[in-house]
Amino acid sequence: MTTKDTWFTEHFQATGSAIGFRVTGKLDEVQSPFQKIEIYNSTDWGKLMVIDGALMLTSRDNFIYHEMISHPALFTHTAPKCVVIIGGGDCGTLREVLKHPDIEQVTQCDIDEQVTRMAEKHFPELCTSNNDPRATLLFSDGVAYMADCPTNSVDVIIVDSTDPIGPAKGLFNRTFYESCFRALKNDGLLIQQSESPLALLELIKEMRHEMSKAGFKAFKTLPFPQPCYPTGWWSVTLSSKQPNANFAFRQTDAQTKPFDTLYYNAHLHHGVLAPPPFIAHALGE
């Protein structure tokens, strides 16, 4: 990461590429017990949240990610009531989940309280549901939380984590997925951010392999644009306990949803279920 000549630049060694944003200065910085969190102001992308030198979100395009990690799973499940979010400290995913009026309970567990406090201060638009009576915000280890989660108690688990390094490394292995499998009801769904399908298909394949070893029977990786992330393309992976799951969604409910979105809609959901051939071939779909 550099800010030379008023640019924030992040280099991606794994993809041999970089991305930069013109900034006017650093607004805030905190070193938590887990990571360094920085906030920059940019000329064209609003504010930037950077964690340990990696860009987490911008004001301009975060809605794409937050909508795609939330609504596809919630409209695929037949009647979600209880949701767990692991990670998600910026609270944008929580906001999207609580747009669904039939959701009764959401527990968000992020290891680093400072991410949420920085989001409340600099991205208040993401935190509008933090005081919703249906929401419980916990600041502790998500791996430990899922290990202690009651059996057959959750409809949808959303793993909104950083990259599989540092504090998030434990969210990408069989042991964690076994905890998720046990906590989910029989018709429950797990959805997790799964990096760039353009550059990191091997990582996605390994994730799905670990999920399979934990007991999950069916998978669907959904790609979408995310301009501020490596390669400009990102994905989430949806997993089911049911072997014959085809991930059909409640299309009528998605079409008539009683809330606004900026990216997600029923037509887009239908299209994202048909991945590009190179993804389908690599993942055996």
From Swiss-Prot:
Species of provenance: Xylella fastidiosa (strain M12)
Q: Where is this protein found?
A: Cytoplasm
* Record lineage: Bacteria, Pseudomonadati, Pseudomonadota, Gammaproteobacteria, Lysobacterales
The family line of this record is:
Belongs to the spermidine/spermine synthase family.
Which GO biological process annotations does it have?
spermidine biosynthetic process
CDD domains assigned to the protein according to its UniProt record, in alphabetical order:
AdoMet_MTases (cd02440)
List of residues binding spermidine: H66, D90, D160, S161, T162, D163
Protein known as: Polyamine aminopropyltransferase
Disulphide-bridged cysteine pairs: none
Q: Where does S-methyl-5'-thioadenosine bind?
A: Q35, D110, D141, G142, P167
PANTHER family for this protein: SPERMIDINE SYNTHASE, SPERMIDINE/SPERMINE SYNTHASE
Give the pathway. Answer: Amine and polyamine biosynthesis; spermidine biosynthesis; spermidine from putrescine: step 1/1
Establish whether keyword Cell membrane is in the entry.
no
